[in-house]
Amino acid sequence: MIAIIDYGMGNIRSVEQALKHIGAAYIVTSDKEEIFRSDGVILPGVGAFPKAMDVLEEKDLVRVLQEIGRSRKPLLGICLGMQLLFEKSEELQDCNGLSLLPGVIRKLKVPYKIPHMGWNELKKEGEIALWNGVEDGSFVYYVHSYYADCPNEIVYGISDYGVKVPGFVAKENIYGAQFHPEKSGDIGMQMLKNFKGVVESWKSSQLSI
């Protein structure tokens, strides 16, 4: 069972429809016990970083997500949800994040339209489980004005928008997509299927303990 975190700032409906499409068992919740009982977690998000962290704090979900991240349970952040995984953001004000990944969220300063909205090429950097069946140079769908300034060793996908935008990051059980896999057609569905597979593998490993 995958828990989609509902904290009032997520693209819940589209993520829900995508998981339904790939046949994944899921629940939309902000209940701490349901999240802990899940086999994997998706943290979506649309909006401002400081507001999102305030809401997560109010719902006591900061602690929950930090525990999930450190438990080896698969965790996928999408768009703002990915940005929240990092140490802090410069959006509107300096604001601490979940600190599950090293790096800072910074504003895009490019000679192009902001937000970065639409389809862009994703170049793979290294191999991870979520790349199974995903061709290098596939196009994915973005909507964002900020990007992750983070160590190269956690970057597994890059798009060019005047700067090298980390489109996909990963460290152990923690994954983050700056783009929207749920809006990225067959390629996005394949990535979500792969995440579903990672979740199922983790569940099997726990049953064998």
From Swiss-Prot:
GO terms for molecular function: glutaminase activity; imidazoleglycerol-phosphate synthase activity; lyase activity. Keywords: Amino-acid biosynthesis, Cytoplasm, Glutamine amidotransferase, Histidine biosynthesis, Hydrolase, Lyase. It is found in: Cytoplasm. It catalyses: 5-[(5-phospho-1-deoxy-D-ribulos-1-ylimino)methylamino]-1-(5-phospho-beta-D-ribosyl)imidazole-4-carboxamide + L-glutamine = D-erythro-1-(imidazol-4-yl)glycerol 3-phosphate + 5-amino-1-(5-phospho-beta-D-ribosyl)imidazole-4-carboxamide + L-glutamate + H(+); L-glutamine + H2O = L-glutamate + NH4(+). Residues 1-205 form the Glutamine amidotransferase type-1 domain. One of its GO terms (biological process) is L-histidine biosynthetic process. Pathway: Amino-acid biosynthesis; L-histidine biosynthesis; L-histidine from 5-phospho-alpha-D-ribose 1-diphosphate: step 5/9. One of its GO terms (cellular component) is cytoplasm. Heterodimer of HisH and HisF. IGPS catalyzes the conversion of PRFAR and glutamine to IGP, AICAR and glutamate. The HisH subunit catalyzes the hydrolysis of glutamine to glutamate and ammonia as part of the synthesis of IGP and AICAR. The resulting ammonia molecule is channeled to the active site of HisF. This is Imidazole glycerol phosphate synthase subunit HisH. It comes from Bacillus cereus (strain ATCC 10987 / NRS 248). The lineage of its organism: Bacteria, Bacillati, Bacillota, Bacilli, Bacillales.
